């Protein structure tokens, strides 16, 4: 059975807060314009508090898991963490969401608007976690 390495819990606490704020800015400023350019509707409704709470909570879980993978990958710089984060985004998040989209859970326009946000968020989180090891 594998043992989990020690990770910097301060970084695991800070990284989700930073990426949550960046995601909020992305969805407020970038995503509506991108969706409009792609021919989709620009959503103007506010996210419910319960949805935001779940989004934040899942980022803490993601940060811990990504921190463990960063230690296992021996990424010791922000650039190394960025690569691990982007790899995780492409290998896991984007593929899962693409599968859900293919089965009718969302549109491909929504997916196209989500891709940059996931790459930014995972990459930034990886960079923070690796730099702050």
What are these regions, as identified by a protein language model?
Residues 1-133:
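Juxtamembrane/disordered regions of integral membrane proteins
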């Amino acid at each position: 059975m594998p043992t989990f390495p020690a990770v910097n819990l301060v970084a695991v606490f800070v990284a989700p807060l930073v990426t949550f704020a960046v995601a909020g800015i992305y969805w407020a400023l970038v995503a509506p314009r991108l969706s409009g350019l792609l021919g989709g509707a620009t959503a103007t409704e506010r996210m419910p508090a319960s949805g935001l709470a779940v989004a934040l909570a899942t980022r803490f879980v993601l940060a811990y898991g990504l921190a463990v993978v960063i230690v296992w990958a021996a990424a010791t710089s922000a650039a190394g963490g960025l690569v691990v984060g982007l790899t995780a985004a492409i290998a896991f998040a984007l593929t899962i969401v693409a599968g859900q989209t293919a089965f009718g859970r969302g549109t491909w326009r929504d997916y196209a608007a989500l891709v940059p946000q996931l790459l930014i968020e995972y990459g930034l989180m990886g960079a923070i976690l690796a730099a702050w090891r």
